[in-house]
């Protein structure tokens, strides 16, 4: 049915109402925003919801959308906050070229109910382009007879910027013969002319080189330079003159390449080689043009395709130069004629591929039609099939809404293929078709169901970040978007658990990933809930419990608590030479932060100064002697012990133990727990020890008395003769017996030795302490 050709009175009323709506919309002022070009993406252009008079969130409720004219989508609308943001960095020169002002039109489309707002974005120019000359060098041939104040045409620099940021001034390097003046064309573009100040003398200087500089009006200004090379030639006193100063021509946009556009003609009154004229296109600041000129005949032909929709009018200057360097110019104005070479374009702004069967007059699509041609070539009509229960409703400015006539019945038909036909009124007519498939679906009455009520997943500590540890799966009995399930994590009940830093879930397939390496020593397990939510409206959801168990890895080496390793003061253990086999020298104490078999420690003696003298118990770290010490054993021993855990692979730590053999060191002897003592043998040994102790005490007492008397006598003799007793000097070995008879103890201490006859042990006990 064609909406523009309605015949019945009812359709006339619809058309009349549509025209009123179009007039109302056209009369409403568009909201205009302005930003500088090259503004970074993400820039906040405006709070659109506030400017349109809506509350925050109302744009999302009404399913607001933004539609751009053209292919560039520079803006994006955050419907939740109502903010209008830049989607990408805009380039004014790429979007508008030399057009000023640069205004981009777009529409804000709201559904439920449908409403349109005309909005414009103006891009202001910034000085982001430097002037550029078309050539790095310009050659001028000037006769030596040229009079001062003669003007020579120079090629203008091109600057993509506009306004004050475009080229504003030209300067030339200091010289004695020329200065440059800056002039304006009818379109406002600046161009330079070189003015002769002082007559040239070819015999004095046959060639000059000048630097021409173009400056724009930016702050700070940008510049571009080119070299002007001047050849001084013999006299040529007539410049070429064109038959017409202005050539106007019309060219259809579908003209083939190399088609003749126009022929220009110039003549030179000079004779000989000075009368030969060469034609060339004078490149101004407007950029390259799709034309080429024959330098001999003056024929201007088409070298590139024309497009009325892109550029409808060209203006260029033709320069005729004789062999003496004199030149003349004319202007060629070319009007491009439009032909019907563009089919209508249909742009879908909003599309709903499925409609609930209970939705009355549901909107299926909002679209716009456009045709860049002009006149009847750009006028369009739009229609759909007659037998379908859908209507096309024109809104404004070539916008249409495709909606259902009333509630649909899924049981009668669950799918519709709607073909939208758009035709222009040109000759011949060009047509565009677009087919939309609409599904009629049930309402959302089934919540997602997990395959398990709870999930347990295991991950080894020290895992790689982004490791896939498992998959959560749910199904939904609905169809279409109602069955599209998205997964998300619920905040944990334990506020101390930073779940967002531990795991993440793929919203589409439920795959769980560990975001960082787990540490069993810090966290052994944690729980959280996963939500599966379908895409219905309103959405239905369900939850499942997930428990992640961290498995311990052997990532901690044993740590030795004792003996402490200190390079400045190494640990030294004292061992009496009279120690029996199995004597406890020391005990190595170590811990492991891991758990299970990764924390089971074993001890091993790797290296010793005297192999076979010491041994270490593998499970408790006790270092004991394995035999009796002899006089041949060195006094200092160095033991290297290894502490190893039971992990895979095992980790270990080593400790160095220094053992010093000493004489007369009294320390309780700790027997091996395995040794079984014979009670009768202990009683015999006890009696023997008692006898030896009494004899030793008596001998020491007698020796002490004798020494005391000898010392007293020596003092008396010394006092009588010299008044002093000389003491021999020299080093006494530390292992020699003390001649005072006091042993290794100081003279100020004595100990009472007691043997218990009924204790059943041979250990000595130190009971009383006496001071002399």
Curated annotation (Swiss-Prot):
Any GO molecular function: identical protein binding
Stretches assigned to the Cytoplasmic side: 712-772
SS bonds (residue pairs): 96-102
Signal sequence, start to end: 1-28
S-adenosyl-L-methionine is among the record's keywords: no
GO biological process, one term: homophilic cell adhesion via plasma membrane adhesion molecules
Cellular component terms (Gene Ontology): plasma membrane
Subcellular location per the Swiss-Prot or TrEMBL entry: Cell membrane
Positions of glycan attachment: 169, 223, 225, 417, 566
Coiled-coil annotated residue ranges, if any: none
Membrane topology: Single-pass type I membrane protein
Keyword terms, alphabetized: Calcium, Cell adhesion, Cell membrane, Disulfide bond, Glycoprotein, Membrane, Metal-binding, Repeat, Signal, Transmembrane, Transmembrane helix
Residue ranges annotated as Extracellular topological domain: 31-690
Membrane-spanning residues: 691-711
Tagged with keyword Membrane: yes
Effect upon mutating residue 143 to P: Changed homophilic interaction
CDD domains: Cadherin_repeat (cd11304)
Sequence ranges assigned to domain Cadherin in this UniProt record: 31-133, 134-242, 243-346, 347-450, 451-560, 575-675
Protein function: Calcium-dependent cell-adhesion protein involved in cells self-recognition and non-self discrimination. Thereby, it is involved in the establishment and maintenance of specific neuronal connections in the brain.
Quaternary structure and partners: Forms homodimers in trans (molecules expressed by two different cells). Forms promiscuous heterodimers in cis (at the plasma membrane of the same cell) with other protocadherins.
Database matches in PANTHER family: CADHERIN-87A, PROTOCADHERIN BETA 4-RELATED
Domain notes: Cadherin 1 to cadherin 4 domains mediate homophilic trans-interaction, the interaction with an identical protocadherin expressed by a neighboring cell. This is a head-to-tail interaction, the cadherin 1 domain interacting with the cadherin 4 domain and the cadherin 2 domain interacting the cadherin 3 domain of the other protocadherin. The cadherin 6 domain mediates promiscuous interactions with protocadherins on the same cell membrane. Each cadherin domain binds three calcium ions.
Protein name: Protocadherin beta-6
Organism: Mus musculus
């Amino acid at each position: 049915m064609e909406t523009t050709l309605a015949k019945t009175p009812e359709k006339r009323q619809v058309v009349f109402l549509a025209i009123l709506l179009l007039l109302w919309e056209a009369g409403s002022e568009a909201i205009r925003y302005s930003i500088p070009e090259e503004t970074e993406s993400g820039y906040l252009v405006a709070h659109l919801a506030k400017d349109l008079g809506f509350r925050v969130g109302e744009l999302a409720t009404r399913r607001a959308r933004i539609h751009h004219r053209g292919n560039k989508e520079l803006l994006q609308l955050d419907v939740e906050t109502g903010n209008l943001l830049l989607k990408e960095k805009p380039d004014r020169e790429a979007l508008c070229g030399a057009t000023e002002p640069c205004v981009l039109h777009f529409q804000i489309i709201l559904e439920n109910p449908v409403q349109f707002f005309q909005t414009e974005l103006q891009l202001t120019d910034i000085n982001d382009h430097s002037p550029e000359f078309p050539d790095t060098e310009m050659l001028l041939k000037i006769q030596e007879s040229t009079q001062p104040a003669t003007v020579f045409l120079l090629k203008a620099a091109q600057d993509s910027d506009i306004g004050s940021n475009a080229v504003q001034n030209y300067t030339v390097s200091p010289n004695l013969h020329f200065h440059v003046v800056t002039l304006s064309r009818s379109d406002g573009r600046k161009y330079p002319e070189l003015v002769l100040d002082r007559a040239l003398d070819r015999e004095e200087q046959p060639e000059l080189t000048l630097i021409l500089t173009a400056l724009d009006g930016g702050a700070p200004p940008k510049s571009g330079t080119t070299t002007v090379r001047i050849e001084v030639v013999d006299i040529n006193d007539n410049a070429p003159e064109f038959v017409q100063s202005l050539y106007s021509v019309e060219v259809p946009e579908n003209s083939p390449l190399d088609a003749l556009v126009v022929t220009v003609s110039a003549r030179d009154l000079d004779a000989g080689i000075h009368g030969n004229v060469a034609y060339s296109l004078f490149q101004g600041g407007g950029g390259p043009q799709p034309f080429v000129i024959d330098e001999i005949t003056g024929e201007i032909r088409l070298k590139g395709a024309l497009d009325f929709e892109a550029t409808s009018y060209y203006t260029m200057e033709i320069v005729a130069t004789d062999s003496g360097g004199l030149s003349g110019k004319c202007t060629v104005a070319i009007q491009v004629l439009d032909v019907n070479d563009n089919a209508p374009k249909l742009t879908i702004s909003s599309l709903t591929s499925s409609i609930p069967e209970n939705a009355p007059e549901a909107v299926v699509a909002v679209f716009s039609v456009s045709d860049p041609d002009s006149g009847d070539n750009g006028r369009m009509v739009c229609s759909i099939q007659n037998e379908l229960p859908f209507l096309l409703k024109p809104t404004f400015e070539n916008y249409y809404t495709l909606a259902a006539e009333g509630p649909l019945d899924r049981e009668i038909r669950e799918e519709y293929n709607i073909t939208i036909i758009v035709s222009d009124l040109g000759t011949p007519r060009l047509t565009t078709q677009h087919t939309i498939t609409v599904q009629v679906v049930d309402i959302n009455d089934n919540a997602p169901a997990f395959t398990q009520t709870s999930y347990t997943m295991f991950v080894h500590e020290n895992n790689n970040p982004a490791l896939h540890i498992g998959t959560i799966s749910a199904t939904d009995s609905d169809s279409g978007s109602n069955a599209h399930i998205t997964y998300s994590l619920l905040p944990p009940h334990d506020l101390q658990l930073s779940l967002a830093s531990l795991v993440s879930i793929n919203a589409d397939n439920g795959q769980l990933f560990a975001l960082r390496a787990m540490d069993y020593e810090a966290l052994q397990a944690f729980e959280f809930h996963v939500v599966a939510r379908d895409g219905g409206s309103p959405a239905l959801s369900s939850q499942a419990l997930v428990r992640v168990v961290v498995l311990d890895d052997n990532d901690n080496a044993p740590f030795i608590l004792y003996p402490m390793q200190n390079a400045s003061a190494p640990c030294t253990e004292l061992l009496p030479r009279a120690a029996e086999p199995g004597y406890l020298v020391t005990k190595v104490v170590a811990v492991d932060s891991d758990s299970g078999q990764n924390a089971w420690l074993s001890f091993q003696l790797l290296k010793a100064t005297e192999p076979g003298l010491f041994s270490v118990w593998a499970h408790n770290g006790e270092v004991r002697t394995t035999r009796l010490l002899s006089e041949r054993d060195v006094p200092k021993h160095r033991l290297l012990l290894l502490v190893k855990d039971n992990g895979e692979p095992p980790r270990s730590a080593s400790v160095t133990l220094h053992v010093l053999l000493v004489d007369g060191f009294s320390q309780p002897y700790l027997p091996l727990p395995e040794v079984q003592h014979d009670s009768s043998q202990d009683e015999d040994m006890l009696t023997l020890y008692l006898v030896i102790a009494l004899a030793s005490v008596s001998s020491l007492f007698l020796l002490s008395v004798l020494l005391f008397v000898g010392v007293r006598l020596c003092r008396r003799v010394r006092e009588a003769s010299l008044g002093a007793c000389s003491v021999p000097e020299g080093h006494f070995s530390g292992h020699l017996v003390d001649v005072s008879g006091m042993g290794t103890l100081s003279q100020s201490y004595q100990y009472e030795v007691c043997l218990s006859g009924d204790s059943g042990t041979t250990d000595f006990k130190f009971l009383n302490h006496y001071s002399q």
